[in-house]
């Protein structure tokens, strides 16, 4: 991502085993990296002759760690928060980091990777929950993975309505994209928490407040889905 152009952010941690860098990065202010990203966006827009009226769509988990900095640099940003079962999030993050890190490092422990990405995912979610309390409702929307998987048109209509955009001109392109990806669908990425020294109970306990606060459907330890609803 463009934030990484400042040698800042967890992209590098997902590719190399660099705990010293991770500790340094955690203590660095994020605003300079986001200001640099804003300048890069201006440069890209100018070079591609993009209309300033066309919004940028930026997606990276890094933003969850840096929401105050992001909103300082982009105060009018509209935020789309996507939600998924933490079991899948942590397992996927650990697997991604593991498969990238083993390319560049000779001695990598999968359990160390699992522990670090559980910690980092918890930090991302905690910071997001804290900042969400002060973000106006008109500036943020929540989209659930299961809802998108079950009825993507309705979910995308909600997003477009939130952004004040007409979805109709874009629907055909979305449908064609899904048709192409379905035709060339690869073997699903498989992983397990146990591979990375983690357990269902540990992850569930770590993110229980999150799943309750955002009505996230979590799978039970047996693999069955259970709706977790926020208490009144």
Predicted regions and their residues:
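PAPS-dependent sulfotransferases, especially Golgi type II membrane carbohydrate sulfotransferases
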Residues: 17-34, 41, 45-48, 90-232
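Conserved phosphate-donor/acceptor-positioning beta-strand/loop module used by diverse small-molecule
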Residues: 59-60, 69-95
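Loop/turn-to-beta-strand initiation segments
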Residues: 51-55, 78
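Alpha-helical scaffolding segments of alpha/beta enzyme cores, especially the outer helices
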Residues: 39, 69-72, 130
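Short, well-ordered alpha-helical microsegments
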Residues: 63-68, 152
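Short His-Asn-centered micro-motif
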Residues: 57-61, 145
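Extended catalytic-interface subdomain
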Residues: 1-19
């Amino acid at each position: 991502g463009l934030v990484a152009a400042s040698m800042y952010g967890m992209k590098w941690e997902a590719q190399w085993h660099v705990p010293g860098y991770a500790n340094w990065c955690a203590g660095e202010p994020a605003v300079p990296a986001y200001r640099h990203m804003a300048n890069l966006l201006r440069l890209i827009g100018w070079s591609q002759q993009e209309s300033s009226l066309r919004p940028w769509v930026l997606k990276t988990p890094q933003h969850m760690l840096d929401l105050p900095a992001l909103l300082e640099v982009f105060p009018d940003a509209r935020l789309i928060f996507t939600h998924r079962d933490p079991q899948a999030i942590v397992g996927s993050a650990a697997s991604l980091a593991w498969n990238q890190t083993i390319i560049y490092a000779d001695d990598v422990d999968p359990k160390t990777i699992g522990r670090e990405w559980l910690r980092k995912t918890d930090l991302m979610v905690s910071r997001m929950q804290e900042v969400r309390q002060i973000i106006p409702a008109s500036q943020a929307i929540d989209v659930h993975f299961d809802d998108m998987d079950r009825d993507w048109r309705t979910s995308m209509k909600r997003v477009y309505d939130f952004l004040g955009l007409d979805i109709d001109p874009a629907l055909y392109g979305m449908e064609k994209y899904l048709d192409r990806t379905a035709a060339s669908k690869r073997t699903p990425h498989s992983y397990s928490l146990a591979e990375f020294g983690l357990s269902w109970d540990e992850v569930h306990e770590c993110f229980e407040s999150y799943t309750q606060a955002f009505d996230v459907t979590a799978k039970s330890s047996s693999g069955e889905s259970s709706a977790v609803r926020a208490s009144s």
